[in-house]
Design a protein with these regions (language model features):
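Amphipathic alpha-helical polymerization modules
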Residues: 1-121
Length: 121
């Protein structure tokens, strides 16, 4: 297999992981005290793409104690998640375009190989 194919395949795996992490962030955006995760990708020649996932510890907004609860059940202020849904939706769109570009690389490689086989036949 060619280096371009391996690189594109590695990128697809990394982008899939990035989509998983972003989807998890969005799914937990309304969970108090949830800390979002961030995916960082690094080129690693010749293996392809290395994925690192880290937690983002910036604080979320603070909510006052729930006044609807009885006084004995009220706690201190609650912290909301630190997820910015708009930012994560933009990340999903960018990831989708990256995914498409890498799929196109694989398709182009396959078409070139097919043409070479047709020439030899």
């Amino acid at each position: 297999m060619s280096e371009a194919f391996n690189a594109a395949l590695s990128a697809l795996r990394a982008l899939s992981r990035k989509m998983d992490v972003t989807a998890n962030n969005i799914a937990n955006s309304q969970t108090n005290n949830f800390k979002k995760s961030r995916v960082e990708m690094e080129d690693v020649y010749p293996a392809g793409v290395k994925v690192s996932i880290s937690q983002v510890n910036t604080p979320g907004d603070m909510l006052p104690p729930d006044e609807a609860l009885p006084p004995e059940e009220r706690t201190q202020n609650l912290e909301t998640s630190n997820v910015n849904i708009a930012e994560d939706l933009v990340n999903l769109i960018v990831t989708e375009h990256d995914f498409s570009a890498n799929i196109k690389t694989i398709q182009t490689k396959n078409e070139m190989e097919k043409q070479l086989i047709d020439i030899k036949v």
